[in-house]
Amino acid sequence: MKNLLPSPISLLFFLSLTLFSCGQTTPSIDFDHAECAHCRMNVVDRQFGAAIITLKGRQYVFDDVGCMIQHVGSGTIAESQVANWYVCDHARPGVLIDATTARYVNGPGFRSPMRGDAAAFATEAERTIALQEKGGEELDWKQLREVLKP
């Protein structure tokens, strides 16, 4: 009778498949078709979109960072259930970056869809250029959440 136990190599293969399939990936936003999870408007502006991924892997998209902060702040999704926060890089429309490490400018020169008026940047140099062109206040993630909280 053949040995019915799997080989160690096949066990490692299936274990690695299981582990990697559970990993969080960067979300994608279907601009012009996706609906903001908070305000239900279509997500159209590639400079201001935002998204979260929960610990269970569910993706929520938002038309600006203010909607994302207010949605979680209102308790609709428990903050403890958010695995990753993302925002669109204002300098590279449609490209999602880590919201917790992004550099922000908040001011009326940045007319975001729901008037949070906050723009995210991947680099300090890009934020500096935006500040010179449009003005506003420099913020980090913690400060931005305080300004835009519900």
Predicted features along the sequence, with ranges:
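Short aromatic-glycine-(Arg/Gly/Cys) micro-motifs in beta-strand/loop hairpins
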Residues: 48-53, 101-113
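Residues immediately within or flanking Cys/His clusters that coordinate Zn2+
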Residues: 33
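Post-signal-peptide N-terminal segment of Sec-exported extracytoplasmic proteins
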Residues: 37-75
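C-terminal motif of bacterial Sec signal peptides marking the signal peptidase cleavage site
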Residues: 18-21
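C-terminal partner/receptor-binding element of secreted or periplasmic proteins
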Residues: 122-150
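Mature extracytoplasmic domains of secretory-pathway proteins
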Residues: 61-97, 104
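Bacterial N-terminal signal peptides that target proteins for export
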Residues: 1-11
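Bacterial signal peptide processing site
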Residues: 23-25
